[in-house]
Design a protein with these regions (language model features):
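Structural signal for interior beta-strand "rungs" in well-ordered beta-sheet cores
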Residues: 1-14, 23-150
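Long, leucine- and charge-enriched amphipathic alpha-helices
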Residues: 149-188
Length: 188
């Protein structure tokens, strides 16, 4: 708890910044050197917080990284620099919360959930195992999948994907029927 945050800078715009701005286009690939930004903040743990084995909570760059009262952090959880976690949250094993994310109160992040940097996860959000949250999540939302989506939409999308082989076979059968009908018309 309180290790240096994962903050680095380059003298000029980095390839990562360029891709973030252009959504994938990259000019010339050039040499770049990373310089550490030392973390001057601390870590504040509220009352009744529990931290599992091998969990890592980075200290903030300037302000503190905060874990709210009553929050339970499982083993092998990574909380990045400047993160704020609300009260009474559950962060299950292998959760990763990137720097400067804000997590509301009573949030449950299932095992292997990933939260991108600089986003907000609202109060009472529940994210099922292995969900990847790339954008802000409104309060009360139940999320699944990668990228995260409403549970109902994820379940429907998964059902549709499982139906694809059957649908493909039906389309192939229809194509064959149409082909035979066209050949019959050509002969008549």
């Amino acid at each position: 708890i309180g290790g240096d945050g994962f903050s680095f800078v380059t003298p000029e715009k980095s390839g990562v910044e360029e891709i973030r701005e252009t959504l994938g286009e990259r000019q010339a690939i050039r040499e770049q050197h990373w310089t550490r930004i030392h973390s001057l903040g601390g870590v504040e743990l509220g009352d009744d917080v529990e931290i599992g084995a091998n969990a890592a909570i980075d200290r903030g760059t300037i302000r503190a990284t905060r874990i709210g009262r009553g929050t339970k952090v499982d083993s092998l959880v990574q909380v990045g620099h400047n993160v704020t976690v609300g009260e009474d949250c559950l962060l299950c094993g292998l959760v990763g919360i990137a720097g400067s994310a804000r997590i509301g109160n009573r949030v449950v992040l299932g095992g292997q959930v990933g939260v991108s940097d600089n986003i907000f996860v609202g109060d009472d959000v529940i994210a099922g195992g292995a969900t990847k949250i790339f954008t802000n999540a409104p309060a009360g939302r139940v999320l699944l999948g990668s990228p995260a989506m409403k549970m109902e939409a994820h379940v429907e999308a998964t059902k549709n994907i499982r139906r694809l082989p059957r649908l493909y076979a039906q389309v192939a059968e229809l194509r064959e029927t149409v082909k035979k009908l066209l050949e019959k018309d050509d002969r008549d």
